[in-house]
Amino acid sequence: MKLPPFELHVPRTLDEALALRAALGSDAKVMAGGQSLLPMMRYRMLRPYALIDISRIEALTRFDAGPAVRMGAVVTHADVEHCAHPGPLFDLLRAHAADIAFVPVRSRGTVVGSLVHADPAGDWPLLLAALEASVELASLRGRRTVALRDFVRGAMDTDVQVDEIAVAAALPAWASGLTRWGRCKLMHRAGEFASASALAVQRADGRWTCWLGAIDPGPLELPATAGLLPPAGAARPTREEVAASALDEIRAARPHGDPLAASRHAQAMARAVEQAWQGVST
């Protein structure tokens, strides 16, 4: 299906983009990679009068390695997949990026675009929520930073205001010191959106954080399950115990959810934890 007619603006500076955003208001959409926006336009789910293509703004291409990692709005999945920075955090980021769709999508799709799209099945909302990321928003009124857990308000619903552009995603300094991680992404076929996904991360102080993705209305934290996981060297819960704890938390948080989906997510969490202990992440 062909795209509907629209007016295209290609600013070269952020100031120019923000001026366009303020002038065009709700009649315009901001596009970085277009891997979610353009298909929605083809199927007439969205019909903006204008697109503001920010992919040529050099200031938004920066990928700062830390100690507080920061990814500009035009940093693609492929940029993350092929980054050369060392350490467990970047091993996790690379593995996560490499598992997204196919090469053409990873070459155009952006990390921040995934957050703004806020599809519950998207990959980056899960990982960046678990790492306590924040989103930087800019407008002619100024800048503000919003924690990702507050930024995503629901399925495809975020805190971006009509005159704002999401310009970066940033990780806190503690994320650079994580010691181990495990992730699990269940798909019907390679390259598809996940039917269930899970992430377990251990911080430098030994504490764990456990999150689920591909679940409505957005990423779900499992603090009780994380509390079961001890520091390295201590007695570990069994896979069955992890799955049972996760299932209890899912049922409590989503009492009207699909029981089969809840079971899939619980098993994904158990696999993610198991891989974290083994030092194997797939």
Task: Give the positions of each predicted feature.
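C-terminal structural segment of proteins
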Residues: 1-282
